[in-house]
């Protein structure tokens, strides 16, 4: 079995893809599902998300739609929530569908979905559960894909990829690529999770925006057993990816 880590999304994924955007999209996605959301719809643009509000609301009034997302770390005008896992964890989303659009993570998921057979969302908070689920699904390769920040490699995503890779290697039966070796080296040399995240460029930026609590939340390891898994079906609006708890 191959274990591959892409430091940025590249595509051409033949099997299982695990998408990581620790600060903050995949961490927040897990929080939404932890707080009862029925599903997540990931869009490519804010405009697609805003256009879905009446469509989804009319299609299922018992599953009201809320929008969550950010640009440059700040909430998108017209959205109900930003991209804060702390904010999400304080809400009750039971019976709701959350439409997400973010600067990096949602795009990475769309790249992964172009060819991947199974797409999972992972963060530090669900790292071990995501690794186990990926191992159970894979037949030839697990690709851990780091979303990065504005098309640049992100320390925090590579660190988290190393956490997943380390756990998967402990399960045995993998050959690894250089991306995985880089992630494992990062995991072993950077220090503890909060140090890794807070010292990253993105972590420092969030701290400057007054969002340091999000960084601390995202640094928790394996506090959740929920794994967002891509699903298909006729009820998935065009231009979106639907994830449910797996």
Swiss-Prot record:
Disulfide bond entries: none
Cofactor(s) the protein requires to work: Mg(2+)
Catalyzed chemical reaction(s): (2R)-O-phospho-3-sulfolactate + H2O = (2R)-3-sulfolactate + phosphate
Coiled coil spans: none
Stored InterPro entries: ComB-like, ComB-like_sf
Pfam families for the chain: 2-ph_phosp (PF04029)
GO molecular-function terms, A-Z: 2-phosphosulfolactate phosphatase activity; magnesium ion binding; sulfopyruvate decarboxylase activity
EC number: 3.1.3.71
Keywords on record: Hydrolase, Magnesium
Enzyme class per UniProt: hydrolase
Family membership: Belongs to the ComB family.
NCBIfam families in alphabetical order: PRK14100.1
Name recorded for this polypeptide: Probable 2-phosphosulfolactate phosphatase
Phylogenetic classification of the source organism: Bacteria, Thermotogati, Deinococcota, Deinococci, Deinococcales
Underlying gene: comB
